[in-house]
A protein has these predicted regions:
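Active-site cores that bind ATP or allylic diphosphates and position pyrophosphate for catalysis
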Residues: 1-235
Length: 235
């Protein structure tokens, strides 16, 4: 039976680093407060080496100022466009958007300054920051309650392979031959393998990836690569 382990030294939303086991919120705060730099500063690397597995820290160091850091406010203009284009009566169709939250969004959207600022503005005792942030992401990505019900009813409709080791090609081949669900390795060939609901889920996932890619492309000045263009990773 699954059970939770209480974190020692720091709380879930603690924003200060501790000697070890700091919260994700604290680690994000450190990363987001770093002044513009082409590389991750050595003192920050030293701090994070006590908080993160070596592999995770290595990824941050290698991707710094190339594809990270990315924060919610980087999606502010995209979200503002979506909120301005949505009529009041349509907001409630999105996952987690209640009538109360819809009303607050419409009443306050002219005060929108950034993703984070708007979450704080909308927050009440009944509507937490996390709930609002999640709801706004659903609006941004056009994820409706109807979508979620369809995905839940169809459970696991496919498996998309993102990468594999070259010496285990036989495992991938066996999966394709014997799996009870479609195994997707190329997006362009997925349409004929999937049900309408599974295709919709995969298309939404690809759209979210492309949206994220467009943000890092604009922020860091790197070429945009769509999800359709990305190749499976072989190591």
């Amino acid at each position: 039976v699954p059970f939770t382990l209480k974190r020692e030294f720091s709380g879930y939303h603690d924003t200060e680093l501790h000697d070890c086991s700091s919260s994700a919120s604290a680690i994000r705060k450190v990363l987001m407060n770093i002044p513009a730099s082409p590389y991750l500063p050595k003192n920050i690397s030293a701090q994070l080496s006590e908080q993160l597995p070596p592999g995770s820290l290595s990824i941050i160091q290698n991707e710094w100022n190339f594809s990270c850091p990315v924060e919610a406010d980087d999606f502010s203009l995209l979200l503002k466009y979506r909120l301005l284009s949505e009529p009041h009566e349509s907001l409630c169709k999105y996952q987690d958007v209640s009538e109360e939250l819809s009303n607050r969004i419409i009443r306050n959207r002219n005060q929108f300054r950034s993703f984070g600022q708007f979450c704080t503005l909308l927050k009440t005792k009944e509507l937490t920051y996390s709930r609002i942030s999640r709801s706004l992401l659903h609006i941004l990505l056009s994820i409706t309650t109807e979508d979620m019900h369809a995905y839940q009813d169809n459970s696991c409709s496919y498996a998309r392979i993102l990468g594999f080791r070259k010496e285990h090609t036989d495992v991938l081949r066996a999966m394709k031959d014997h799996a009870s669900i479609p195994i997707i390795t190329k997006l362009g060939k997925s349409a004929s393998l999937l049900s309408p609901e599974a295709s919709r889920m995969l298309n939404q996932t690809s759209f979210a990836s492309d949206l994220y890619e467009s943000v890092i492309s604009d922020k860091f000045g790197i070429p945009f690569t769509s999800e359709q263009q990305k190749q499976i990773i072989r190591v």
